[in-house]
């Protein structure tokens, strides 16, 4: 039980030393991550659509032989 108390005291002391980011910085970083994720998602969607069309075209050529 004593070790648990020491551990929790150490955790509390460490949390006091943490330099937390400002709200403004957190909001800006969050917006950046959302925009980047959306951009990557759109890029992958276009890539998937393109490959789907190419494969469908190739398979349609094979079917006409």
UniProtKB/Swiss-Prot annotation:
- List all membrane-crossing ranges: 28-59
Domain of life, per the record? Answer: Bacteria
Q: Where does the protein principally reside?
A: membrane
Keyword line: Cell inner membrane, Cell membrane, Membrane, Protein transport, Translocation, Transmembrane, Transmembrane helix, Transport
Q: Which residues lie on this side of the membrane: Cytoplasmic?
A: 1-27
Q: Where is the signal peptide?
A: none
GO terms in the biological process aspect are: intracellular protein transmembrane transport; protein secretion; protein targeting; protein transport by the Sec complex
Q: Which GO terms describe its molecular function?
A: protein transmembrane transporter activity
Give the location in the cell: Cell inner membrane
Q: Which InterPro entries match?
A: SecE_bac (IPR005807), SecE_sf (IPR038379), Translocase_SecE/Sec61-g (IPR001901)
What is one GO cellular-component annotation here? Answer: plasma membrane
Q: Which residues lie on this side of the membrane: Periplasmic?
A: 60-65
Q: Does the keyword Cell inner membrane apply?
A: yes
* Membrane topology label: Single-pass membrane protein
Recorded family membership: Belongs to the SecE/SEC61-gamma family.
Tell me the function of this protein: Essential subunit of the protein translocation channel SecYEG. Clamps together the 2 halves of SecY. May contact the channel plug during translocation.
Recorded protein name is Protein translocase subunit SecE
Organism annotation: Aquifex aeolicus (strain VF5)
